[in-house]
């Protein structure tokens, strides 16, 4: 433990020292939520603090919620790039793509991007190129396991609707992966791309009784209540991509917690502020993948949760 603390202190010291005597570094934060403080923001703060970097002394966070509005995300990204920020932190693929279209020079670190190569954000994982790096949430790689967990929790499911945003290229790739593994799991996959909340609600209302639902990444940015309320009403067998949804009432999720990803990405942020180039920093994969279940929802829906799933679960919400 002492060695870890010493290593973090040595890592952060040059940046803190450089910040003395001049204005703190400015980090623009663009995220999908409705309020400034969301899990990715809190995760970023925690990660920077663990590195010994203090808000106010070493850096400031200029936070821009986009309320699920892609056009607003583009506007905020363009304004931040022109304002002289030292780095932009982007949550979600579509926000990261908006930032990339706004600037080719301001460094960007992303989180909650399922497949950054498929999304066109980086040239490759080991050699990102350009002004971009970040933490991949592995949407494509985790899709087979998500379907396996869906089948384990809801064994009667035979048909699964994969609903994703039409502009989210990572989710499109995950939908193709779902098709590839469907035969092995004896499932029929129906992939549907949507663009608006109305599209999403309309699509979900066409689910047949007993149909399963898979959301490989965020479908509609910042509106979890819509999909969760509909799930509870229709008693869908559904699996989500992060524990955030389970905490809000979903039955089960498998994937990386966004606050953990943001804390992990803080190391990349610090390295860039120290002078390293994003193109030289390989894209990292989420280092925390967890299975989470919500027992209250399980009880409300009358689901018999397999003992193996309860034992395997990393997080259980009572």
Regions found by a protein language model. Name each.
Residues 1-318:
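Short hydrophobic alpha-helices and adjacent helix-cap/hinge residues
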